[in-house]
């Protein structure tokens, strides 16, 4: 195992340990704040899995988050379907993946890459948000849909109700940990190696026998499916869904979370989302108008001081201490 993998697993283990002990020191409100931040972290990790491994930026990624949220809401809103929560989650994942498969097929097999891909996905996000506003008979229009029930299911004869703060926090934290670890395993395996080769030189990768458009499509679909899962979890915890969840603002914010946390690290975007969401909650409680300015300053500082994101701090400190030891 190379040093980079050991560092990642060590940071992951520390974060998991902190997530386990956090409920012992937090009240209900703090648990809900971190729970929601973890969901956004899962959303950020889904974008990073595609953007970080392929180098192609999807600027409308919130569309998949919103699609997942609306599908979850429509399936569970009346609370009349048996196993509604499970069907809602499966429907959200499948719906987001289906839309990504259709769009991605024409883009990747049509040779659309780089800034052109970014522009097309930006338009996709705008279209999805406008559809959510205009299709008011289904989506509720500008007001969205409210009264979405929390996730409920039976596990080994025990009924689990995620309307409470602690169970919902544990459930979300477990989902995020498992998904991030699974994505990291994929990224560090042969699939991730081929994606890196495609990112470096797609023509050369194709000459070696790799079907680059298909690889990119599958990665894009998996990324969208996880974004749909995050959207489904969010609307169940929040109890509502609105067009803003598929809008340009959220698509921009998730890019910032990934950049702040560290693109290509998967765990970094989760930490970036938690850091920014927590900072926003704290600062906005004192002066809401101050937050956009501070966010811009934080982003500029990260770009110049920590271009690899906050997750690179550990590696930098480790290298610094090693350098001092050698100097002595």
What are the residue ranges of the model-derived segments?
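Transmembrane alpha-helices and adjacent helix-loop boundaries
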Residues: 1-328
């Amino acid at each position: 195992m190379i040093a980079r993998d050991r560092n990642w697993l060590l940071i992951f283990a520390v974060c998991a340990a902190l997530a386990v002990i956090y409920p012992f020191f937090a009240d209900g409100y703090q648990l809900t704040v971190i729970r929601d931040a973890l969901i956004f972290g899962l959303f950020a990790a889904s974008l990073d899995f595609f953007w970080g491994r392929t180098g192609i930026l999807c600027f409308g990624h919130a569309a998949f988050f919103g699609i997942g949220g609306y599908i979850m809401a429509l399936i569970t809103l009346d609370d009349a379907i048996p196993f509604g929560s499970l069907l809602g989650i499966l429907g959200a994942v499948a719906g987001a993946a289906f839309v990504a498969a259709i769009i991605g097929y024409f883009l990747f097999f049509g040779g659309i890459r780089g800034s052109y891909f970014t522009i097309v996905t930006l338009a996709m996000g705008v279209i999805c948000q406008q559809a959510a506003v205009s299709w008011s008979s289904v989506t509720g229009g500008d007001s969205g849909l409210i009264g979405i029930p929390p996730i409920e299911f039976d596990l080994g004869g025990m009924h689990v109700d995620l309307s409470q703060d602690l169970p919902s926090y544990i459930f979300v934290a477990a989902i995020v940990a498992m998904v991030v670890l699974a994505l990291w395993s994929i990224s560090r395996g042969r699939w991730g190696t081929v994606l890196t080769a495609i990112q470096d030189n797609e023509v050369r990768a194709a000459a070696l026998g790799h079907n680059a458009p298909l690889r990119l499509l599958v990665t894009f679909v998996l990324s969208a499916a996880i974004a749909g899962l995050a959207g489904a979890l969010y609307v169940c915890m929040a109890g509502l869904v609105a067009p803003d969840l598929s809008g340009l603002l959220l698509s921009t914010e998730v890019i910032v979370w990934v950049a702040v946390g560290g693109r290509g690290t998967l765990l970094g975007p989760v930490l970036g989302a938690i850091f920014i969401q927590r900072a926003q909650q704290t600062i906005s409680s004192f002066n809401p108008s101050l937050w956009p300015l501070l966010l811009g300053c934080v982003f500029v500082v990260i770009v110049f001081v920590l271009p690899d994101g906050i997750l690179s701090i550990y590696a930098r400190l480790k290298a610094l201490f090693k350098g001092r030891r050698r100097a002595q």
